[in-house]
Amino acid sequence: MHNQYGSIFSITTWGESHGPAIGVVIDGCPAGLSLSPEDFLPAMARRRPGQLHTSPRQEPDLVTILSGVYQNKTTGTPISLLIENKDVSSSSYEHLQHCYRPGHAQFAYEGKYGFADNRGGGRASARETASRVAAGVIAKKILLSQGIETLAFLSGFGTLESKNYPKLSDSLIQQVHTSPFYTLLPQEEIQNLLLLNPDDSFGGVVSFITSPLPIGLGEPVFGKLPALLAAGMMSIPAAKGFEIGAGFSSSQMTGSAYLDAFIADESGVSLQSNRCGGALGGISIGQPLEGRVAFKPTSSIKKPCSSVLKDGTPIAYRTPNQGRHDPCVAIRAVAVVEAMLDLTLVDLLLQHRCTQL
């Protein structure tokens, strides 16, 4: 259950980290959208392991379109995408079958189901997010056709952090996409932290921004734009916090300091500031959407940690040297955050078209 996300534009992901393949089925995509396997390459490359300061697992992450596309056009029927797992190394996990890995979902999965696939995290692995990124490519194409641009970037790495939301532009997108860390932070400072802590891992923050959204995205009460975004973002493995606009810092403000004043000019009514993050009453108001997602440090580290065998015997657990893990999962989570943003916005955009005759 709960492998589906979205209402009108919905996705269902499937597969495990060390299975033969993972994939996603997209339902609700309008017909006539141009789509080819090459369209997936840039986004998949940003999430793909085996790059600088990410997991050394080598996965090409080539997307195969199985259905829903004919002559490079979507047909309006379900689109099925397949991504093969090419670099599986399950032997690294065989000796871990009898102990609990600190910080991993294995203990929870075994408690819930009575059985769990322990190879590389199974269904709980961040490998699953490759399917979301693939689906997000289709969502982004729809958004761009409606004049909506989106971007996610690494805004926090360990103690390094920037809370500013820059204005979205082509040059900003290019700057983020050409950075090895997908960030506006000083790259040499990130590299120094990694070099000084080779046996440890780091948490991070991923910010997301959009061009001004159409007024009306989001539904009252349980379908609010920030609420749906929070659900999508917090479903990403290792996500531990979400905020929109001023977020948690708004709790330390006075009303006079927080309120966004309305202004009007020849282009219409807008806000003087955007501490609300682009939504009032859970509905977009024509402003850019701005938010952040916090990610915990990767649990797989080379430093020893206390744990127990499944029979309760205490042990000193250490991640095996042959294991392949990210020093900071937030780096590759940039592409996933952007995908979840795109998937949420497309679904709400299509819902909004049903609001008025």
Curated annotation (Swiss-Prot):
Gene3D superfamilies: Chorismate synthase AroC (3.60.150.10). FMN binds at R123, A124, S125, G281, K296, P297, T298, S299, S300, R324. Pathway: Metabolic intermediate biosynthesis; chorismate biosynthesis; chorismate from D-erythrose 4-phosphate and phosphoenolpyruvate: step 7/7. One of its GO terms (biological process) is aromatic amino acid family biosynthetic process. Reduced FMN (FMNH(2)). One of its GO terms (molecular function) is FMN binding. Keywords: Amino-acid biosynthesis, Aromatic amino acid biosynthesis, FAD, Flavoprotein, FMN, Lyase, NADP. The keyword Flavoprotein applies. Belongs to the chorismate synthase family. This reaction introduces a second double bond into the aromatic ring system. Homotetramer. This is Chorismate synthase. It comes from Chlamydia trachomatis serovar L2 (strain ATCC VR-902B / DSM 19102 / 434/Bu). The gene is aroC.
